[in-house]
Amino acid sequence: MAEVHVIGQIIGASGFSESSLFCKWGIHTGAAWKLLSGVREGQTQVDTPQIGDMAYWSHPIDLHFATKGLQGWPRLHFQVWSQDSFGRCQLAGYGFCHVPSSPGTHQLACPTWRPLGSWREQLARAFVGGGPQLLHGDTIYSGADRYRLHTAAGGTVHLEIGLLLRNFDRYGVEC
């Protein structure tokens, strides 16, 4: 089978109005993909930027996949959360990006968004925190239901990904 190695890190995030940020991440693939090593999801530590608005996580990603075809190419999805001084967490943004299909090192910037909700939910978010969240996580990367949401732009998640492709020519998989 053809193999894909995804090695890199979630560098951090910038452009969020909230501070004390952390990120929950995961990777979604099609049915023809098999994870040989690594973990499909994880969470970074909380970082509060001291200078500027960049929260640094330097969270490693190391995944090894085998595949029979290109359909269902891996997509990384993110949930960025902020934590207040009482330890309460509220959603700062959702985002996703496709893993690049060409080998080499890639710098990625993944824009995020969050659902707005009704004016009452927006008012409650401003005063007591919280706010609307997605019921189904796959809405982040599947566009079928996403177009109906009213959203607000969030910040950007920054990644550095190295991609290695192996045996694609031997098994007739063309990139």
From Swiss-Prot:
Main location: cytoplasm
Any one GO molecular function term: gamma-tubulin binding
Gene Ontology process terms (BP): cilium assembly
InterPro entries: C2_B9-type_dom
Keywords: Cell projection, Ciliopathy, Cilium, Cilium biogenesis/degradation, Cytoplasm, Cytoskeleton, Disease variant, Joubert syndrome, Meckel syndrome, Nucleus
GO cellular component: centrosome; ciliary basal body; cytosol; membrane; MKS complex; nucleus
Location(s), subcellular: Cytoplasm, Cytoskeleton, Cilium basal body; Cytoplasm, Cytoskeleton, Cilium axoneme; Nucleus
C2 B9-type domain span: 2-118
Related illness: Meckel syndrome 10: A disorder characterized by a combination of renal cysts and variably associated features including developmental anomalies of the central nervous system (typically encephalocele), hepatic ductal dysplasia and cysts, and polydactyly. Joubert syndrome 34: A form of Joubert syndrome, a disorder presenting with cerebellar ataxia, oculomotor apraxia, hypotonia, neonatal breathing abnormalities and psychomotor delay. Neuroradiologically, it is characterized by cerebellar vermian hypoplasia/aplasia, thickened and reoriented superior cerebellar peduncles, and an abnormally large interpeduncular fossa, giving the appearance of a molar tooth on transaxial slices (molar tooth sign). Additional variable features include retinal dystrophy, renal disease, liver fibrosis, and polydactyly. JBTS34 inheritance is autosomal recessive.
Subunit relationships: Part of the tectonic-like complex (also named B9 complex). Interacts with TUBG1.
Biological role: Component of the tectonic-like complex, a complex localized at the transition zone of primary cilia and acting as a barrier that prevents diffusion of transmembrane proteins between the cilia and plasma membranes.
Family of the protein in this entry: Belongs to the B9D family.
Protein name: B9 domain-containing protein 2
Organism the protein comes from: Homo sapiens
Gene label: B9D2
